[in-house]
Regions:
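Alpha-helical transmembrane segments and their immediate juxtamembrane cytosolic regions
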Residues: 1-254
Length: 254
């Protein structure tokens, strides 16, 4: 495998005739940098919820400052690229708008909170439902000033995504505690062969483009409730294909 990777690096040439070189790392790079920063924060803070929530709030406020306002089209804090602060946040720590940091810190807080509530009488599912409602309300309020955008990594996107994740996590924990873990077996391939499942949509997308299928999709596939439904169906198809590949012993390993 290592020899194959070295061979591919040596023979790689981009459409402009350039050899392989470092470039923007994409979403996986953003995730990696975010995990690194948040891991360091957790290393020093550990399970101190007050400090964890403070760091989450800092990331969230930073996203509000860095993202473009809907009304003006400009961010509240526009940092020049030759500025020292820009160098630290965007070139050394690579936190960008802070949205990914807020999402990751939210996950850490949720995990720590679950551990702390295990020995108490407060039902975890009730707690997560209340928190999800508060986060959704925050998303509704901030949406008056910023758009909901994953690409721009805005605050409303962070809050709405967090609300959905927290609520579903609480429901899943509750169902598992009731012995219903088997209900989620149909999506197990996504966790057992994560990298394979991650690449399946890209493979399908290229196949669709090759045969012109992507050009004949109806408009309702792109937006609204039916658009969401089509995304869910496509996701399940990808999980199903991953399951088939596992059965054929086709699996990518890291």
């Amino acid at each position: 495998g290592v020899a194959l990777l070295i061979f591919m690096i040596v023979i790689y040439v981009d459409p402009k005739g350039n050899l392989i070189r470092a470039g923007w790392w994409g979403i996986l790079g953003l995730i990696g940098w975010t995990y690194l920063v948040c891991a360091f924060i957790y290393y020093f803070v550990r399970t101190d919820l007050k400090k964890l929530i403070l760091m989450w709030a800092i990331f969230l406020v930073w996203s509000m400052l860095r993202c473009k306002l809907t009304a003006s089209g400009e961010p509240l804090l526009n940092i020049p690229q030759n500025n020292a602060l820009y160098t630290v946040t965007d070139q050394i720590l690579n936190i960008g708008t802070g949205a990914h940091g807020a999402l990751t810190m939210g996950g850490i807080i949720l995990s720590v909170t679950e551990l702390k509530l295990r020995d108490k009488k407060i039902p975890f599912v009730a707690f997560t439902t209340i928190v999800a409602a508060i986060l959704a309300l925050g998303g509704l309020i901030t949406n008056n000033f910023w758009i909901i955008s994953k690409i721009q990594a805005t605050a409303p996107w962070v809050l709405y995504s967090s609300a959905v994740a927290v609520f579903l996590y609480g429901v899943i924990v509750w169902l598992v505690s009731k012995g219903k873990a088997s209900w989620f077996k149909f999506i197990a391939p996504a966790g057992e062969a994560t990298l394979t499942c991650y690449l399946v949509p890209t493979i399908l997308g290229n196949i669709f483009m090759l045969f012109g299928i992507s050009q004949i999709r109806p408009e309702w596939c792109h937006s609204g409730f039916l658009g969401i439904l089509s995304c869910i169906i496509f996701s399940l198809v990808c999980v199903g294909l991953t399951w088939c590949m596992n059965k054929l012993y086709l699996k990518l390993k890291v």
